[in-house]
UniProtKB/Swiss-Prot annotation:
Chain residue ranges for the region called Disordered: 1-117
Subunit structure: Forms tetramers.
Comp. bias regions, Acidic residues: 32-45, 87-96
Stated family: Belongs to the GAGE family.
InterPro entries attached to this UniProt entry: GAGE, GAGE_fam
Annotated Basic and acidic residues bias: 103-117
Note: This gene belongs to a multigene family expressed in a large variety of tumors whereas in normal tissues, expression is restricted to germ cells. These genes organized in clustered repeats, have a high degree of predicted sequence identity, but differ by scattered single nucleotide substitution. Their sequences contain either the antigenic peptide YYWPRPRRY or YRPRPRRY which is recognized by cytotoxic T-cells.
Protein known as: G antigen 12F
Length: 117
């Protein structure tokens, strides 16, 4: 009796060595002064400011909804993911979340029914 199936053992692949980046010198805050203090544009150049896209969108929303009454509270929740009270849905990135800790999971009693998603 000889077994001619394929082996399930795979040899480990050789690791590729990646050289670390060269250290030129100590990191100093002076090297990153443009991130801390933005440079002021000259008089001939238009002023461009780096803003957070969400902050820019809020500014646009305020101007558009100024005469439309109170604002809906869409900013209190995640946009596109309304809270339903169900904790077994995918995360905001569409990836599955880790399973809950079995010690923290409570089993429903006989009279109660657990909500299904």
């Amino acid at each position: 009796m000889s077994w001619r199936g394929r082996s399930t053992y795979y040899w480990p692949r050789p690791r590729r060595y990646v050289q670390p980046p060269e250290m030129i010198g100590p990191m100093r805050p002076e090297q990153f002064s443009d991130e801390v203090e933005p440079a002021t544009p000259e008089e001939g150049e238009p002023a461009t400011q780096r803003q957070d896209p969400a902050a820019a969108q809020e500014g646009e929303d305020e101007g558009a909804s100024a005469g439309q009454g109170p604002k809906p509270e869409a900013h209190s929740q995640e946009q596109g993911h309304p809270q339903t009270g169900c904790e077994c849905e995918d995360g905001p990135d569409g990836q599955e979340m880790d399973p809950p800790n079995p010690e923290e999971v409570k089993t429903p009693e006989e009279g109660e029914k657990q909500s299904q998603c």
